[in-house]
Amino acid sequence: GVMVAAALPAASLLGPTASDRVVGRDVVEPPVDAREYPSPLSSYRHYNKDLEDESLIRVSNLPKGARVRLGAMEVYDGTTFGMGVTNNADGTAGYRRVGSTIPGRSAETAGEQASVSTSQLLGPWVPTFGEVSVLRFEPSDPGAAEQQKGLNYDLWAETALTTGPTGQFNYSLSTTMPRDHEDSEFASVDAARYTGTDTNVPKDVDSLASEHTTSARSDLEKARAIESYLHTDGFYSNDDTINSRPGSSQDRIERMISAEPLVGDDE
């Protein structure tokens, strides 16, 4: 027989050196955690007071009745409302990197085409409306490539953000406006189970809600009863006065719901 021997460098038997080691996080970007950014609500007074006469968001072809959405906040921490880690059965919750086309959707199925430009907005939030299928930043803008690469979308909240340059956005979007529903369509439907982690909720909130929903039978009737109470017994103020204090802190909410009359504002 013939014996064949192969000589290999010792290093190749020991595996790659430290400088050659590939770690998963080096090639796979982790999901965006919206909690790392200030809540969109934190800029409300700045927009409403300091930039009152400025055009912050311009939209062409905005569908009739559509509301431009800057963010969806579902968690309260005693200081402000913000984004949390919302889990749901179909996995649509949370921001996911999307490129330009939202998974499961296409421009061909979208009912509306529009263009949006923003100026002086704070944070990574990209204004949207409806159920977006495609969102493309204007290629001629200096930061468009990074904005597009950093585009993330939350299918559960129907909101967008970008990890690219912020402050000024120019983009087109294809979207579909959901139809309006009648209350009767939800008569036998229970509200989705809340999986968030609210903390430091003002102690009187639960008692106030219970007090005004005693005769309500369904979850929708409870929501409508609270809505009716706020509309009928509450007052709206857009003045920066003692009755319309800034913020949504625990103390601010406690004072609001215990006061006579109850006075609130858009914030």
Predicted regions and their residues:
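Helix-boundary/low-complexity linker signature
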Residues: G1-E267
